[in-house]
UniProtKB/Swiss-Prot annotation:
Residues bearing carbohydrate: 93, 236
Swiss-Prot/TrEMBL keywords: Amidation, Cleavage on pair of basic residues, Disulfide bond, Glycoprotein, Phosphoprotein, Proteoglycan, Secreted, Signal, Sulfation
GO cellular component: extracellular space; secretory granule
Chain residue ranges for the region called Disordered: 64-507, 528-555, 620-646
InterPro entries the record matches: Chromogranin_AB, Chromogranin_CS, Granin
Organism: Rattus norvegicus (Rat)
Protein name (Swiss-Prot/TrEMBL): Secretogranin-1
Function, as annotated: Secretogranin-1 is a neuroendocrine secretory granule protein, which may be the precursor for other biologically active peptides.
Disulphide bonds in the chain: 36-57
Modified residues (Arginine amide): 674
Length: 675
């Protein structure tokens, strides 16, 4: 019975171990468990005196049971880490990695991938996440180590208790004492090995954490060094500026310097307080600093970081801080009232020299300077080194666009309320050149300052274009306009006659335009007339505007020549004969009469010949026996009744006229062939 109970217990334990084996374990663990179960069953059935379970199989089964309990423990730890996630989100990645490592139960190896992850956590990544991890892990490194070591010890103690309970269940009191002693020895040895392995693992993890904490502390120390260097350089520059200020200033400037020193002392105290504060208060202290301290230019940071061994880390950290503090600075600048601008709006206030050159769009640029040009030149001779000037100018010039627009709007309001003529400071030429090179916008100046700044030659050139609005300026401007207008008029006088008396157009234009619109167009007839001087007809036809240079429209012009009315009086019947012929066909107009106006008889013969040709071409149109209406026929009969019959003499005359007509026609054809 006892043997059967033992076999049943072993089978149940083996089945439970097989069923509860995690899915993530490989085939090797499953094979070991099945082999152990088969060996136990075969030994129990074959040999009664032999030990039922070998120590190797006992270790395998114990490991499988521990894995089941490890899963439950991992779930509990996951729930704990989820609660911790809500409180401390920076430990999420570390907690999840530890829980997954404990669930699998795999040994921790110092792989290069884990080292890369640690390096990326501490050196890579964005500004916010890296700073948060640095802050929170530098705050709580000891707590994490203590909690993890306590968990490891607690799990070891629980494992030892569970082993004892299993042994008590499997072997009742008073039975198999020898086997139990041997098993206890084996378990103690395995427990020692397990403890040694767990101790090694905990030591390796502790070493890694210590290395990462040391790395973070070194990085933090470097950042603090750079911040302290920058602040000390700023304070030293301000002190040297204060010491080098001339003591020739009035009492009002001295009182303003004292107030400024008090403010700078307060700023130095706040900077010392921020140095003493721990790392996790660094973000708040940064937001309380003035805007020009929070926003240093990238060029200055690169100069500081070039001498460091880890310049890339410092630059990325500064960029991340800038991104993080950008919104906080903007809100702080909006919420806090600008007392300096309110003071500057009063007439008795005069800005100190330290605030004279600020960023673009600020009111300090427009504040009146109490000193004269001689004092400025003296001060410039004793001026501090160029590096300090460039650093201060760069620091003040790198303001954000939001603050620029905000202060610019305020500045426009102050300037709109009241503006005095001497409100703009007179800048030294060297200082303004330096400011322009550094990227500042030019300050609005009076004409006197611009005259001093530019050499005489440049001012004479500018005087032609930009004159003052006084009497001399008006006279000079009118003289200048007259000088500018005179060469244009002379140019027009030179070019207009060329355009007026241009050479006569080509034969193609004359054929296309002159002969097309006027059959009596002859260039030789009026070559010396006034018509040629007024402009060519074909040029005016080609103009799209319909106007020439004098503003005369096409309709007002006379495009046709002055006709010789004496010559037309000698042709009494030409209009009656040829009254509609030129209107009907311009392209086929005869050129004989155009060329032979000197010969009256030939012109008359030519008209008669054309009349006869058209009569032959259109007999119905010229025939008297055409079809007529009844009324016209009655009138025609009356005319015939009135007409008398021709005599023989009249018939002979008509025949002679016809013969003469034929001869004249031949003569006219000969002339036309010659021409």
């Amino acid at each position: 019975m006892q043997r059967a109970m033992l076999l049943g217990l072993l089978g149940a334990a083996a089945l439970a171990a097989v069923i509860s084996a995690p899915v993530d374990n490989r085939d090797h663990n499953e094979e070991m468990v099945t082999r152990c179960i088969i060996e136990v069953l075969s030994n129990a059935l074959s040999k009664s005196s032999a030990p039922t379970i070998t120590p190797e199989c006992r270790q395998v089964l114990r490991k499988s049971g521990k894995e089941v309990k490890g899963e439950e423990k991992g779930e509990n730890e996951n729930s704990k880490f989820e609660v911790r996630l809500l409180r401390d989100p920076s430990d999420a990645s570390v907690g999840r990695w530890a829980s997954s490592r404990e669930e699998t139960g795999a040994p921790v190896e110092d792989s290069p991938g884990q080292a890369k992850v640690d390096n990326e956590e501490w050196t890579g990544g964005g500004g916010h996440s890296r700073e948060a991890v640095d802050d929170q892990e530098s705050l709580h490194p000891s707590n994490q180590q203590v909690s993890k070591e306590a968990k490891i010890r607690h799990s070891e103690e629980r494992g030892g208790k569970e082993e004892e309970e299993e042994e008590g269940k499997i072997y009742p009191k008073g039975e198999h004492r020898g086997d139990a002693g041997e098993e206890k020895k084996h378990t103690e040895e395995s427990g020692e090995k397990h403890n040694a392995f767990s101790n090694k693992r905990s030591e390796a993890s502790a070493k890694k954490k210590e290395e990462s904490v040391a790395r973070a502390e070194a990085h933090f120390v470097e950042l603090e060094k750079t911040h302290s260097r920058e602040q000390s350089s700023q304070e030293s520059g301000e002190e040297t500026r204060r010491q080098e200020k001339p003591q020739e200033l009035p009492d009002q400037d001295q009182s303003e310097e004292e107030s400024e020193e008090g403010e700078e002392g307060e700023e130095g105290a706040t900077s010392e307080v921020t140095k003493r504060r721990p790392r996790h208060h660094h973000w708040r202290s940064q937001s309380n600093k003035p805007s020009y301290e929070g926003r240093r230019p990238l060029s200055e940071e690169r100069k500081h970081a070039a001498g460091e061994s880890k310049d890339a880390n410092v630059a990325t950290a500064n960029l991340g801080e800038k991104r993080g503090h950008h919104l906080a600075h903007y809100r702080a600048s909006e919420e806090e009232p600008d007392y300096g601008e309110e003071l500057r709006s009063y007439p008795g206030f005069q800005a100190p020299q330290g605030l004279q050159y600020q960023g673009r769009g600020s009111e300090e640029v427009r504040a009146p300077s109490p000193r004269s040009e001689e004092s400025q030149e003296k001060e410039y001779k004793r001026n501090h080194p160029d590096s300090e000037l460039e650093s201060t100018a760069n620091r003040h010039s790198e303001e954000t666009e939001e603050e620029r627009s905000y202060e610019g709007a305020k500045g426009r309001q102050h300037r709109g309320r009241g503006r005095e003529p001497g409100a703009y400071p007179a800048l030294d030429s060297r200082q303004e050149k330096r400011l322009l090179d550094e990227g500042h916008d030019p300050v609005h100046e009076s004409p006197v300052d611009t005259a001093k700044r530019y050499p005489q030659s440049k001012w004479q050139e500018q005087e032609k274009n930009y004159l003052n609005y006084d009497e001399e300026g008006d006279q000079g401007r009118w003289w200048q306009q007259e000088e500018q207008l005179e060469p244009e008029e002379s140019r027009e006088e030179v070019s207009f006659p060329d355009r007026q008396y241009a050479p006569y157009p080509t034969t193609e234009k004359r054929k296309r335009l002159g002969a097309l619109f006027n059959p009596y167009f002859d260039p030789l007839q009026w070559k010396n007339s006034d018509f040629e001087k007024k402009g060519n007809p074909d040029d005016s036809f080609l103009d799209d505007d319909g106007e020439d240079g004098n503003g005369v429209t096409m309709t007002e012009k006379n495009f046709f020549p002055e006709y010789n009315y004496d010559w037309w009086e000698k042709r009494p019947f030409s209009e009656d004969v040829n009254w509609g012929y030129e209107k009907r066909s311009f392209a086929r107009a005869p050129h004989l009469d155009l060329k032979r106006q000197y010969d009256d008889g030939v012109a008359e013969l030519d008209q008669l010949l054309h009349y006869r040709k058209k009569a032959a071409e259109f007999p119905d149109f010229y025939d008297s026996e055409e079809q007529m209406g009844p009324h016209q026929e009655a009138e025609d009969e009356k005319d015939r009744a009135d007409q008398r019959v021709l005599t023989e003499e009249e018939k002979k005359e008509l025949e002679n006229l016809a013969a003469m007509d034929l001869e004249l026609q031949k003569i006219a054809e000969k002339f036309s062939q010659r021409g």
